Design a protein with these regions (language model features):
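Non-transmembrane accessory domains of multi-pass membrane transporters/channels
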Residues: 1-61, 101, 105-121
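Soluble C-terminal extramembrane regulatory/interaction domains of multi-pass membrane proteins
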Residues: 3-10, 63-192
Length: 193
């Protein structure tokens, strides 16, 4: 749910997203996180009774909630499209980032389900780096002088959200790696019996 929602929100920055669509995206991700929290509480009870050796889901939950916050910030900027002159400069980089982030999140989800190592982060790092460069280039062109205060606020908010997203995806990488490491001994142990 998060992969599709972040991808849609990033795409919406260039062409705009209706508030109802954004609300639906948020609800889907929040529902998934709520289900994860329920499973996490049950797993904590099992761990405390020594019925399970599953990793603690709390750090993963915190990271996913941070990603939800990134989605909300990006979604708020996507309510109205950025002006064409800005979109021309940052749109291609945002499209690349949208695809890379969506793919990375889907692959992280698959890794969590299978207990495997996280996917390579290089493509998403490259795409978000290209976004940062595109936003820096846009700041240097003088285009921003022609923006209204609201447009300027949205421009800087999306830049900030992308920086936060990069940090939170790095955190997610660590959490997926921890889950994969915790799952590997259990699989090896089960296979040897």
């Amino acid at each position: 749910a998060a992969a599709a929602a972040l991808g849609d929100a990033l795409a919406g920055v260039t062409h705009g997203l209706h508030r109802d669509v954004l609300s639906h995206l948020y609800d889907g991700v929040a529902g998934s996180l709520s289900r994860l929290r329920t499973v996490g509480v049950e797993a904590a009870h099992e761990r405390s009774a020594h019925l399970s050796s599953a990793p603690d889901s709390a750090p993963l939950e915190r990271t996913l909630y941070r990603l939800l916050t990134d989605l909300v910030i990006i979604g708020r900027t996507a309510g109205q499209p950025l002006p064409d002159m800005v979109t021309a400069g940052v749109g291609p980089a945002l499209a690349e980032a949208s695809a890379a982030v969506g793919s990375y999140l889907r692959d992280c989800g698959a890794a969590l389900l299978t207990g495997k190592a996280p996917p390579p982060r290089r493509p998403v790092e490259h795409a978000l780096g290209a976004c940062g460069a595109a936003f820096a280039a846009a700041r240097g062109t003088g285009w921003l002088r022609n923006l209204t205060d609201v447009e300027l606020e949205r421009f800087f908010a999306i830049g900030f959200a992308l920086e936060q997203l990069r940090d939170h995806l790095e955190d997610l990488d660590h959490e997926v790696a921890d889950w994969g490491t915790a799952a590997r001994p259990a699989r090896v142990s089960a296979a040897s019996q």
